[in-house]
From Swiss-Prot:
Catalyzes the removal of terminal sialic acid residues from viral and cellular glycoconjugates. Cleaves off the terminal sialic acids on the glycosylated HA during virus budding to facilitate virus release. Additionally helps virus spread through the circulation by further removing sialic acids from the cell surface. These cleavages prevent self-aggregation and ensure the efficient spread of the progeny virus from cell to cell. Otherwise, infection would be limited to one round of replication. Residues 1-6 are intravirion. Homotetramer. InterPro entries: Glyco_hydro_34, Sialidase_Influenza_A/B, Sialidase_sf. It comes from Influenza A virus (strain A/USA:Albany/12/1951 H1N1). The gene is NA. One of its GO terms (biological process) is carbohydrate metabolic process. HAMAP family: INFV_NRAM. Inhibited by the neuraminidase inhibitors zanamivir (Relenza) and oseltamivir (Tamiflu). These drugs interfere with the release of progeny virus from infected cells and are effective against all influenza strains. Resistance to neuraminidase inhibitors is quite rare. The keyword Amino-acid biosynthesis does not apply. Glycans are attached at residues 44, 58, 63, 68, 88, 146, 235, 365, 455. This is Neuraminidase.
Length: 470
């Protein structure tokens, strides 16, 4: 083959390759156009149905590698219209308690990014229930978890996440800088109360829908503190209780009425022989009932009930089935403070039904272990130690902690009554488990049902120590 023939042959091959490449490019353009037309047609069809599509992305990090677990398209059909929560309904009749949520946050936190927390609580709007919690500005199994047994620090913050989920940086919403807190929804927006600052000058910051609306300064300069559970909203007004003063003697207790984040009224309780801390409150037929912790001298729980004008009544649960911890053995109760083992205490709750009362308490008399619900049909007014129903939810051998009430309004459930619910904190780590450098907790929750339920144990279940502890 002479040089001219070689040139012609090479040129022909190049032209053939170029032609094939051009055909492939044209085919690619046609394919993209067809695909786009199909997608556009699908979107137009969705628009005709007048539905909104929300894409939920579930992502995580595994050993520093980003993994997209799932992308799920969900048709959002729930009405998000705002409405004022009336709070006028009575509590639903119940026979027991059904498990509602369990977040397993300590177990998950041994390998995943989960916040170190304490004082979790639950509050519901007319659309959803959320878990609120006080972080320590640290993650489990990380060096900054060291020393998180401390209650009050500038690193603590109130955050929230969907109920039943382990609180992590990826699903949690910042609410307020706080080492003591409360939150509730009036049907129009979230009210959050976050207390932070020095012991002798703490400040409560009130926010409504995330905007600062009011400030409350410590009036006794002795650790201003609030409920560590949900506040209560009735007919557009929200109510909360704060304490300022000694934890082992008479202190100052104030009820605040708040509308859209602004304080409209407040009163101080005249209760020189009572002690109110960490109150668990709920609405009942337009009034507010709070069952609290007496850290001074009562092993039975104090209560305060008030209407929307803040006219109030006070007392102690009379039952000989004692609700605090530490406490004596059940026996003879009193409608005044029961002084036996009355010092110290733990946050708790009860639900009043006429003269009867559902009492939530640790199973242990002396340590924060186990949890049970007891129905005393005459316990609000009578002092005997008899009861009719006991339901176990955490075994005596497993750690518990704080507990508190929350309700689900008829606007959420569709019922014609207020559904009573409660949560239990499952504390792990220090000071009891000294193999760890940290203190944190997970949570479980239950709601009242008018049907048979079951005795069982839903413990935290994490195996300690973690890698950071070794």
């Amino acid at each position: 083959m002479n040089p001219n023939q070689k040139i012609i042959t090479i040129g022909s091959i190049c032209m053939a390759i170029g032609t094939i490449s051009l055909i492939l490019q044209i085919g690619n353009i046609i394919s993209i156009w067809v695909s786009h037309s199909i997608q556009t047609g699908s979107q137009n069809h969705t628009g005709i149905c007048n539905q909104r599509i929300i894409t939920y992305e579930n992502n995580t990090w595994v050993n520093q590698t980003y993994v997209n677990i799932s992308n799920t398209n969900v048709v959002a059909g729930k009405d998000t219209t705002s409405m004022i929560l009336a709070g006028n309904s009575s509590l639903c009749p119940i026979r027991g308690w059904a498990i509602y949520s369990k977040d397993n946050s300590i177990r998950i936190g041994s390998k995943g990014d989960v916040f170190v927390i304490r004082e979790p609580f639950i509050s519901c709007s007319h659309l959803e229930c959320r878990t609120f919690f006080l972080t320590q500005g640290a993650l489990l199994n990380d060096k900054h978890s060291n020393g998180t047994v401390k209650d009050r620090s500038p690193y603590r913050a109130l955050m929230s996440c969907p109920i039943g989920e382990a609180p992590s940086p990826y699903n949690s919403r910042f609410e307020s800088v706080a080492w003591s807190a409360s939150a509730c929804h009036d049907g129009m927006g979230w009210l959050t109360i976050g207390i932070s600052g020095p012991d002798d000058g703490a400040v409560a910051v009130l926010k409504y829908n995330g905007i600062i609306t009011e400030i409350i300064k410590s009036w006794r300069k002795q650790i201003l503190r609030t409920q560590e559970s949900e506040c209560v909203c009735v007919n557009g007004s929200c109510f909360t209780i704060m304490t300022d003063g000694p934890s082992d003697g008479p202190a100052s207790y104030r009820i605040f009425k708040i509308e859209k984040g602004k304080i409209t009224k407040s009163i101080e309780l005249d209760a020189p022989n009572s002690h109110y801390e960490e109150c668990s409150c709920y609405p009942d037929t337009g009034k507010v009932m709070c069952v609290c912790r007496d850290n001074w001298h009562g092993s039975n729980r104090p209560w305060v009930s008030f209407n929307q004008n803040l006219d109030y009544q006070i007392g102690y649960i009379c039952s000989g089935v004692f609700g605090d911890n530490p406490r004596p053995k059940d026996g003879k109760g009193s409608c005044d403070p029961v002084n036996v083992d009355g010092a110290d205490g733990v946050k708790g709750f009860s639900y009043r039904y006429g003269n009867g009362v559902w009492i939530g308490r640790t199973k242990s008399n002396s340590s924060r272990k186990g949890f049970e619900m007891i129905w005393d049909p005459n316990g609000w007014t009578d002092t005997d130690g008899n009861f009719l129903v006991k339901q176990d939810v955490v075994a005596m051998t497993d750690w518990s902690g704080y507990s508190g009430s929350f309700v689900q309004h008829p606007e959420l459930t569709g019922l014609d009554c207020m559904r009573p619910c409660f949560w239990v904190e499952l504390i792990r780590g220090r000071p009891r488990e000294k193999t760890t450098i940290w203190t944190s907790g997970s949570s479980i929750s239950f709601c009242g049902v008018n049907s048979d339920t079951v005795n069982w144990s839903w413990p935290d279940g994490a195996e300690l120590p973690f890698t950071i502890d070794k």
